[in-house]
Regions:
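Active-site neighborhoods and metal-handling regions in enzymes and metal-associated proteins
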Residues: 1-286
Length: 286
């Protein structure tokens, strides 16, 4: 890697200024680059590049829309395989295979990697993204469906809460509360709105419904070149501490989640997730 940097930049006449994404460079790598270009001035360009990535090109949006469509197909395949006695891992494999075949069909000349599914049942749903297991589904289980197609490094997702055969009263009440917050969140996403303002209003709604203390993480985030392996744009998170104003061609999710601890009525994790493309006057739910 360092040899490639030297061959591109040149060592005999090093540039006066070199930009680094400091949030991705380790201390060891920073020291090595500094020793190679000791006369150059280094600047952190991570925030600037992050802001560029937050606004998607039309080509990027097309990839993301195809990803969302393929995520739906993965979810459809998972639902077909949900039945008592089937395991989380086998159901996950079915959804993943459906998505990968569709990615190949849509992008026959691409390179394929990282598409995955998380599918949890029962109390295994209690984390944002718990590992899947060999647990067998039983009637009355709460289920968490999560599909993640990866297309040329572009990440999309579909996440839904389901129940096998029957949802008890407390589980249904919790699910309905989370769905209500999710629907309100979809209405709030539009150009000119601050990320933090969306969160504050949804927090108030959760409090009215009596579930705010069960909320577990942010309400959504940016989409694009990212994954759970290599991060995302921290400046476009739907969190109380992010004051970024939504703009045209930004792409964000709305995904409220509540988690009711084991041993309590309705125990498990509840999450609904949609992706929206910000337009001039509103947002398109893809």
């Amino acid at each position: 890697f360092l040899k490639a940097i030297v061959s591109i930049i040149g060592r005999d006449e090093p540039p006066k200024n070199i930009g680094l994404e400091n949030d991705h460079v380790t201390l060891d790598m920073r020291e090595k680059i500094g020793s190679l270009f000791s006369f150059s001035v280094f600047s952190d360009v991570s925030k600037h590049l992050m802001e560029l990535r937050m606004i998607k090109s039309n080509e990027e949006i097309e990839i993301i829309k195809n990803g969302a469509r393929i995520a739906d197909l993965g979810g459809e395949e998972i639902v077909k395989n949900i039945r008592e006695g089937n395991t989380e891992i086998e159901i996950s494999i079915a959804g993943r295979d459906r998505m990968e075949r569709e990615i190949v069909k849509t992008y026959p000349d691409a390179e394929y990697m990282d598409t995955w599914v998380w599918f949890q049942s029962g109390i295994n749903t209690d984390g944002a993204h718990n590992p899947k297991t060999n647990r067998k589904l039983t009637k009355g289980d709460i289920l968490s469906l999560n599909t993640f197609p990866m297309i040329s490094g572009y990440y999309t997702a579909l996440e839904r809460t389901l129940f096998l055969d029957h949802a008890d009263d407390e589980s249904l009440k919790a699910w309905e509360a989370n769905v209500k917050v999710h629907k309100r969140g979809l209405e709030l996403i539009k150009p000119g709105v601050k990320c933090s303002d969306i969160c504050h209003e949804l927090n108030e709604l959760f409090a009215e419904l009596g579930y705010l203390h069960y909320r577990t993480f942010g309400y959504g985030h940016s989409f694009g070149v990212l994954s759970h392996f290599y991060g995302r744009e921290a400046g476009l998170e739907l969190r109380e501490d992010i004051d970024t104003v939504l703009e045209e061609n930004m792409v964000v999710s709305m995904e409220p989640m509540i988690m009711i601890p084991e041993g309590n009525p309705g125990a498990g994790g509840y999450r609904e997730h949609d992706i929206l493309v910000i337009g001039k006057d509103g947002a398109e739910n893809i």
